[in-house]
């Protein structure tokens, strides 16, 4: 396990913690897409079904458990604990537009037709597009709170670091996972515009705002 993998995991974990802290401290989930969080919870659930049957390392197991807990606690806070603050009017992305093609693709393009492998592939494809409801929500409202932009930045950084991890593994281990790499590139592309706005606005102390579609 190389440094890019570890830094990627830490960036991912930091993003999730930032989101949880934001919701808990403000007692509000305004500006957060519950649909994206449901998709992320589904990603971790389908990816980590081998949690108790395939031991790799203590680090790997602990991270799986932590990611699952963070994902489901986030969903709980959005849809139960602070549901009165949930911005349902703007969280309107149609999940079937993602779930249907992702499900179909996971059956068509995978490494083997076993239930665990198909579900793992499904989780990889779904993660690459799970952030779209959140980005759609931001484009619809025209702005995002600073803490939300930090959350998105560290999610995007996690993906960039994982791309570096795969490059490093190819160089040192001659290992190449086409499904993960292609999906990771697609996911990173979705963050490109956001990265630009983050650097030019948020890091300069300005609020991230976008033109509201008519």
From Swiss-Prot:
GO terms for molecular function: KDEL sequence binding. The keyword Membrane applies. Residues 47-48, 159-169 are annotated as: Interaction with the K-D-E-L motif on target proteins. The record marks 5, 117 as: Interaction with the K-D-E-L motif on target proteins. Keywords: Cytoplasmic vesicle, Endoplasmic reticulum, ER-Golgi transport, Golgi apparatus, Membrane, Protein transport, Receptor, Transmembrane, Transmembrane helix, Transport. Residues 1-4, 53-58, 111-116, 169-178 are lumenal. It comes from the Eukaryota. Residues 25-32, 80-92, 136-149, 200-214 are cytoplasmic. It is found in: Endoplasmic reticulum membrane; Golgi apparatus membrane; Cytoplasmic vesicle, COPI-coated vesicle membrane. Residues 204-207 are annotated as: Important for recycling of cargo proteins with the sequence motif K-D-E-L from the Golgi to the endoplasmic reticulum. One of its GO terms (biological process) is retrograde vesicle-mediated transport, Golgi to endoplasmic reticulum. The record marks 193 as: Important for recycling of cargo proteins with the sequence motif K-D-E-L from the Golgi to the endoplasmic reticulum. Belongs to the ERD2 family. This is ER lumen protein-retaining receptor 3. The gene is Kdelr3.
